[in-house]
Amino acid sequence: MGQTSANDNNANLKYPTLDKRIKETFVANSAATNKNSLYDSYLRAIRWSIDRLGDSGVMVFVTNNGWIDGNTAAGFRLSLENELSDVYVLNLRGNSRTAGILAKRERGNVFNIRVGVSITLAVKREIPDDVCIHYRNIGDYLSADEKLAIVDRSTLDNVDWQIIEPNIYGNWLDQRDEDFESWPGLGKGCVR
């Protein structure tokens, strides 16, 4: 019958060296309970690429955009902050796994897939500076064609980038209030 899925011949491939690096960086920086998603293939590719940059270089990825504000991905974002000089993220949105007004705001997906999409360009300089996170949300209610037209005419210089000041938890967007940590825990077993 042949191969029915791309994973048929690749199920559970092990990458011991790469997974060790992910454990030392993304996982070590994460406070999430379940860290399995940090071993996702696109995060593996980014970890591999950062390590291959050496002292300096540039990398670009088009990926799922869930890492931008996902709780589990805070360790990944903290690693980007620690290891890179500039990170440019163009959030193309398009997450159709939402409902109501949020689904209307996300609207068109540039690849006609269910998850949102982002373009990330990262720069690593030989002499490290504090990282600068450049973020742009492409906008609300845009069709896939409108988003692609914006991408087509965009350059690093003409995009109105928002400079993100990450907090100590690795939050870039929707940052939590730091006073929250001083509040007493609720429920049994909650100890700070």
Mark where each language-model region is.
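Sequence-level detector for compositionally biased, low-complexity segments
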Residues: 9, 17, 29-32, 48-192
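Mobile active-site "lid"/loop adjacent to the S-adenosyl-L-methionine
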Residues: 2-38
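Alpha-helical packing segments of well-folded alpha/beta enzyme cores
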Residues: 41-45
